[in-house]
């Protein structure tokens, strides 16, 4: 008779290799000026976090002009409020800090969950059905890149 050895099973989880490291190499961190950045946040956007995240993953670690071009051509509904947010952040950078739009670079683009608006829809036989409208907060950080010599 053979005996089996009981061993604790630990599943191996392969880590996904993120493409962000490649994109982050486009502009070395020593060329990003540490305190030369502009924050812009928009709160309570009526959109799912996952839909916004899909668009923000495409624009992170890109220059401003490239970002505007990508957002204009994206077929997602989530790209319009994000485009307005990026425009506003760039306008703040040029108006208040006298930055050049050609040197602006998106270093941080994140989305977080906000409140959920709950409504009830009338159904058959006097019953009601809950509708949950999710909202999100989006934060964009534009950093200025100094010119290489």
Swiss-Prot record:
Keywords: Chloroplast, Plastid, Ribonucleoprotein, Ribosomal protein, RNA-binding, rRNA-binding. Its main location: plastid. One of its GO terms (biological process) is translation. It is found in: Plastid, Chloroplast. It holds the Pfam family Ribosomal_L22. Gene3D superfamilies: Ribosomal protein L22/L17. CDD domains: Ribosomal_L22 (cd00336). SUPFAM superfamilies: Ribosomal protein L22. One of its GO terms (molecular function) is structural constituent of ribosome. GO terms for cellular component: chloroplast; large ribosomal subunit. It comes from the Eukaryota. Part of the 50S ribosomal subunit. This protein binds specifically to 23S rRNA. Belongs to the universal ribosomal protein uL22 family. NCBIfam families: rplV_bact. HAMAP family: Ribosomal_uL22_B. This is Large ribosomal subunit protein uL22c.
């Amino acid at each position: 008779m053979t005996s089996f050895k009981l061993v604790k099973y630990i599943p191996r989880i392969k880590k996904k290799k993120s493409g962000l490291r490649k994109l982050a190499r486009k502009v070395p961190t020593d060329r990003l000026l540490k305190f030369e950045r502009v924050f812009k946040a928009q709160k309570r956007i009526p959109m799912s976090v996952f839909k916004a995240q899909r668009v923000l993953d495409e624009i992170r670690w890109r220059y401003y002009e490239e970002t505007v071009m990508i957002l204009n051509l994206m077929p997602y509904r989530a790209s319009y409020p994000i485009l307005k947010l990026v425009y506003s952040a760039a306008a703040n950078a040029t108006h208040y800090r006298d930055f050049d739009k050609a040197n602006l670079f998106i270093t941080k683009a994140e989305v977080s969950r906000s409140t959920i608006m709950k409504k009830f829809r009338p159904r058959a036989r006097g019953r009601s059905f809950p509708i949950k409208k999710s909202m999100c907060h989006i934060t964009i950080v534009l950093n200025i890149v100094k010119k290489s010599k």
